[in-house]
Curated annotation (Swiss-Prot):
It comes from Aspergillus terreus (strain NIH 2624 / FGSC A1156). It comes from the Eukaryota. GO terms for molecular function: metal ion binding; metalloaminopeptidase activity. One of its GO terms (biological process) is proteolysis. Belongs to the peptidase M24B family. The gene is ampp. Mn(2+) 2 binds at residues 449, 460, 572. It is an enzyme of class 3 (hydrolase). This is Probable Xaa-Pro aminopeptidase P. Mn(2+) 1 binds at residues 460, 558, 572. One of its GO terms (cellular component) is cytoplasm. Coiled coil: none annotated. It catalyses: Release of any N-terminal amino acid, including proline, that is linked to proline, even from a dipeptide or tripeptide. The keyword Signal does not apply.
Length: 654
């Protein structure tokens, strides 16, 4: 599962005798016969919705209105009740910003969703392709629409304080202004059709899985706050709260979190969550250490804290710490910049470094998850090739979930399974829908990006298979991606190295061909938490220069290759950073490397061994031997799957 950037339209020659003879520069477009696939996605008529929104904008004296994707906690994944951008635009991808003026509307998203957005947006909308040269950012488009002293409105709960300041400064240069608008105007348009907020129960995440008590975590956080000489920390990120208190929920699909806020001071711990969501077990778990308050009272309490701080010591009083991802609304309630200090959350940093119990859980859950994947791919090949069964992408995804659910400690999926055949694989965050998805073609590449939540860890894995005979082009592309994945997996680097610096390792072999993939190479992964976790990552994002890879980080390694309209390739393992022994220690500092924990075969018939070095062939063979060793015992009574696993983990050679 991955971040950012667009799929690439590639140019390859079909006139070659072997993989090594593929042209290295200025290749020509090739032509292959591609069966017809159902890739259309439903387009929503937004005319009436936009008309009603524009009337509300006039009522609130707003000329341009911004509709972000995020909720009040700046969550990447959101509950259905917070799907405002999707409701107003019709675009269902997980990332994007909608901007509506009194006469125009635009949707900005990144390259994972260009294909999807172009299909889902109706004629009312302009698609702003983020990161494409010559295309305006949503901020630039907004500023242009607001020229002449116009007012731009946004729900202050849905934009970060830093984002609001930056946009406001840009607008002011243009003679325009930014205005916080409550209630949310899209909610008013949505009306009674808007889904109700979730009311599911919160559960305790036992220490045998968490590895540390919540009291110890709060104690360590207080030590950090003491170093910063702050009055306290106001927490709004849902995964940080779940991690800190060793609690989990189901308020957001695939993310075991619950709607809440928290305030930690040197002497108090307050958790803002509605009481009816807390079971007796949760209340006993929190005990006398935590004061529970209603979820909606956070803003009033923040204002009271701000007022009390001013009254007690004025401007000389310690400031409250606030995450740089916290909302503008929360910042304003605490008194804004004068009374808050925005920083990268110390909880995010602590959460990203898994303890020994969490790391052991990650290893264990990935073995079980690997067994599920092996059973699934063996089943899928048998159905498609031997039984000639007609299966669509959703049928296959449902089967994978069914197989996963049989395994110990399974708690659900970690994201929507990307089950994609042929050209659908080039839609990087493709989401198959029953009734419109494609029938899986055994003679085309099949890309499956999936993951699960287990009580002892979170998984995320992508495998690309071909159940027929792949072309030389497909094998070449797959092998280049594999080489990059191996290079990152095998990396040794000094402590303090960032994911930004490591990113080139995964891209180098594609770059040598003048090719690239325009998404991140790796993201952090939570421990029975969000499948996308910061603050570190591997990619070209500027923020990845700020956070070095540290021992205990759990990260995805997922280079890819996408030929728009034809196929997609991605190979993804989860890797854990750890200290390694080296012959020398230049600068007398620790050196780090990675341990892979994903245990699933890499499609052998897509590998072109002649493109691999001896060390890369050894890596493939060692990896497959490890997969066999750790998973074959699951199939003692399943000869079909065991035989498939044995075949798919046999050694390769040039």
């Amino acid at each position: 599962m991955l971040f950012s950037h667009p799929p690439i339209r590639l140019a390859w020659s079909s006139a070659f005798r072997s993989a090594r003879q593929l042209p290295l520069s200025r290749p020509r477009f090739f032509s292959i016969s591609v069966p017809r696939y159902a890739v259309d996605m439903e387009t929503v008529d937004t005319t009436e919705r936009l008309s009603r929104l524009r009337q509300l904008m006039k009522d609130h004296q707003v000329d341009v209105y911004i509709v972000p994707s995020e909720d009040s906690h700046q969550s990447e994944y959101i509950a259905p009740c917070d799907g405002r951008r999707e409701f107003i635009s019709g675009f269902s991808g997980s990332a994007g910003t909608a901007i509506v003026s009194l006469t125009k509307a635009a949707l900005s998203t990144d390259g994972r969703y260009f294909n999807q957005a172009s299909k889902q947006l109706d004629s009312n909308w302009v698609l702003l392709k983020r990161g494409v040269e010559g295309v305006q950012t949503w901020q630039e488009w907004t500023t242009e629409q607001a020229e002449g002293g116009k007012v731009v409105g946004v729900d202050p709960a849905l934009i970060t304080a830093s984002g609001a300041r930056s946009l406001s400064e840009t607008l002011q240069k243009n003679g325009s202004s930014l205005k916080g608008i409550r209630p949310n105007l899209v909610d008013l348009v949505w009306g009674n059709d808007r889904p109700s907020p979730p009311r599911e129960k919160v559960t305790v995440h036992p220490e045998k899985f968490a590895g540390k008590s919540f009291q110890d975590k709060i104690s360590e956080l207080r030590k950090e706050l003491e170093k910063k000489k702050t009055a306290g920390f106001v927490i709004s990120m849902l995964d940080e709260i779940a991690w800190l208190f060793n609690l989990r929920g189901t308020d957001i699909p695939y993310n075991p979190v619950f709607f809440s806020y928290a305030i930690i001071t040197p002497t108090t711990a307050e958790l803002y969550v509605d009481d009816d969501k807390l079971t007796p077990e949760v209340k006993a778990h929190l005990g006398q250490d935590v004061v529970v308050k209603p979820y909606d009272s956070i803003y009033a309490d923040a204002e009271a804290l701000s007022a009390a701080r001013k009254q007690d010591a004025g401007d000389a009083a310690p400031k409250f710490l606030l995450s740089n991802k916290a909302s503008w609304a929360l910042s304003l309630s605490l008194g804004g910049e004068e009374q808050t200090e925005e920083v990268r959350s110390p909880i995010a940093d602590a959460k990203a470094v898994k303890n020994d119990v969490e790391l052991s859980g990650m290893r264990a859950c990935h073995i079980r998850d690997g067994a599920a994947l092996i059973e699934y791919f063996a089943w899928l090949e048998n159905e498609l090739v031997n039984k000639k069964t007609t299966l669509d992408e959703v049928d296959a995804a449902d089967k994978l979930e069914q197989i996963r659910s049989k395994h110990e400690l399974f708690a659900g999926l970690s994201f929507d399974t990307i089950s994609s055949t042929g050209p659908n694989g080039a839609v990087i965050h493709y989401k198959p829908e029953k009734g419109s998805c494609s029938i899986i073609d055994p003679n085309a590449i099949y890309l499956c990006d999936s993951g699960a939540q287990f009580l002892d860890g979170t998984t995320d894995v992508t495998r690309t298979f071909h159940f027929g005979k792949p072309t030389e082009l497909e094998k070449k592309a797959f092998t280049l991606v594999l080489k990059g994945m191996i290079a990152l997996d095998s990396a040794v680097f000094p402590k303090g190295t960032s994911g930004f610096a490591l990113d080139v390792l995964a891209r180098q072999y594609l770059w040598q061909e003048g090719l690239d993939y325009l998404h991140g190479t790796g993201h952090g992964i939570g421990s029975y938490l969000n499948v996308h976790e910061g603050p570190m990552g591997i990619g070209t994002r500027v923020q990845y220069t700020e956070v070095p890879i540290a021992p205990g980080n759990v990260i995805s390694n997922e280079p890819g290759f996408y030929e728009d309209g034809k196929f997609g390739i991605r190979i993804e393992n989860v890797i854990m950073a750890r200290e390694v022994q080296t012959p020398h220690k230049f600068g007398d500092r620790p050196w780090l490397g990675f341990e892979h924990v994903t245990m699933a075969p890499i499609g052998l018939n897509l590998i072109e061994p002649s493109l691999l070095s001896d060390s890369e062939i050894k890596w493939v063979n060692d990896y497959h031997a490890e997969v066999w060793e750790k998973t074959h015992h699951f199939f003692q009574n399943d000869e079909r799957t065991r035989s498939w696993l044995q075949r798919e983990t046999q050694p390769i050679s040039k």
